[in-house]
């Protein structure tokens, strides 16, 4: 998450509009007990929208997970979409490898753009970048023909 935060800041400083997608395999709830939107959902609304002059959010109950490509379609007005998770998507990826956390590269070679790591890795035909080299990672994203790819952490 820290890597994505830093990439957002760097890419924004370069003038890009950014969207992010975070996949949570455990489920999540962003609503707060006691708030009107929470009460609407508790009363049975399957979809709740909250809107103001500065923000818009929609909470929708699902019977099955929404297709990844359908989420992407909602964000096509942005220059760059950074994705955390969705390791099985067809997008090309920058995989984050952390010593003590990762034990192997899990992204197939044909889908990998680079590995961002906190240790020196010797990977055949795969670019390895220090995960703290935000400018270099942003340069790589900027250089890619397709601005929409995934960062798997």
Language model segments and positions:
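Solvent-exposed alpha-helices and their adjacent loops that cap or buttress functional pockets
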Residues: 41, 50, 74-75, 105-108
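N-terminal phosphate/diphosphate-binding loop that engages ATP/GTP or pyrophosphate donors
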Residues: 6-62
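Charged helix-capping and loop-helix junction motifs
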Residues: 34, 64-67, 98-101
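C-terminal-of-GTPase-core extension/linker across diverse P-loop GTPases
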Residues: 149-153
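Phosphate/Mg2+-binding loops and adjacent switch elements
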Residues: 80-147
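Phosphate-binding/switch loop-helix module in NTP-utilizing enzymes
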Residues: 60-88
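Walker A/P-loop
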Residues: 1
């Amino acid at each position: 998450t820290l890597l994505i935060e830093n990439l957002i800041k760097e890419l924004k400083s370069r003038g890009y509009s950014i969207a992010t997608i975070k996949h949570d395999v455990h489920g999540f709830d962003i609503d707060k007990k006691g708030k009107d939107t929470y009460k609407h959902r508790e009363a049975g609304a399957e979809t709740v929208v909250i809107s103001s002059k500065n923000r818009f959010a929609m909470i929708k109950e699902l019977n099955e997970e929404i297709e990844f490509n359908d989420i992407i379609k909602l964000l096509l007005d942005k220059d760059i979409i950074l994705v955390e998770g969705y390791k099985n998507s067809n997008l090309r990826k920058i995989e984050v490898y952390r010593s003590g956390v990762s034990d192997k590269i899990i992204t197939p070679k044909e889908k990998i753009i680079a590995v961002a790591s906190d240790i020196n890795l010797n990977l055949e035909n795969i670019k390895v970048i220090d995960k703290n080299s935000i400018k270099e990672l942003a340069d790589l994203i900027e250089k890619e023909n397709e601005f929409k790819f995934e960062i798997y952490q």
